[in-house]
Amino acid sequence: IIPENDRPIDLDSLSRWAHSRIDAHIERCTNEALMEWLLNPHRIGDENNLNREEIIEMAHCGIDLHLEEVRNCHSNLNMEELQKWRKGGQRGTFPAPDGFANSGEHIPPEISTGSITWSEAWAIARPWFVDPDAPPFSMQTIHPEQWFQGEYDLVYRWNGKIRIIDLKASVGNNDRSRLYSEQLRLYSWLWWETHDRGDIVDGLEIWYLGPGKRKIVDSPDEKELIRISKEMKEIYETLGNINSEDDAPLNPSPIHYFEEGGIQIGIADNPVERCKTCPYVALCPQGGHDASLPNHKTA
């Protein structure tokens, strides 16, 4: 909530206030995340590799991307929707976190008169997001049949459209970007399944916080969602019935090359290029290695 005395008169003053929140919270949040990581017995890496300046830069990029949403809201929200918001009323299902109760009557403290103000645009554009202080896995969305779950980072709904945003603390220039688009399409499917197959997501985006770039992902239509549902159920049933290596033949996907922002620029010529750096190559039946141990040794 923007304090009344700090309410901005233009986008520049709103931007200064928003970015100042990073300075106020980044050190505490980083230290808490680091402590949580240190307590994880399965952690990988070295705390000395933590680049605090990089974290700060990515946080500022995230604020800039959200401010684009606020600017669009300020420019495009029609007066009818603005007046409806100003009247307040009963909270909707899963409202955007704003420090107030999630149910009951709610009158927005930012309401004004006349044309939309920047503090109103900030409040209206606020997305639903995962509570950073919530316990792990406590904000997962679960398939009605309880065999699939996922966690949305941001859900924007200010213009009546549903858009799911996935945040990536990366530049987006490596092979991991290959799966990010499919991950988002699965989120779209999960939303559809958990809304009685009635709500279809209107937009999907990946926000790469390294360069501060958006990547637009095509949102599946109803026909595609039905196909995804069938494929996912088949995969789930297959995973539950694997009894030997023959039931899950190894077929590594080729390495894909990307430039920043998750833009694909090529595919490796060697179809098994990723096998060169796979940590499980010594155990793989097709890895070309003998993983057997001497009789007097144990793994």
Q: What are these regions, as identified by a protein language model?
A:
Residues 1:
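Gly/serine-rich nucleotide phosphate-binding loop at the start of the catalytic core
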Residues 4-164, 197-202:
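Catalytic cores of nuclease domains that cleave nucleic-acid phosphodiester backbones
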Residues 58-61, 65, 186, 230-238:
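Long, highly charged amphipathic alpha-helices
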Residues 130, 144-147, 176-177, 191-299:
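Metal-dependent nuclease catalytic regions and adjoining charged, substrate-binding loops involved
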Residues 161, 170, 209-212:
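Short connector loops/turns at beta-strand edges and beta->alpha or beta->beta junctions
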Residues 167-176:
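Short beta-strand-loop-alpha-helix junction that forms the active-site gateway
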Residues 181-193:
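An active-site-proximal "capping" alpha-helix that borders the catalytic cofactor pocket
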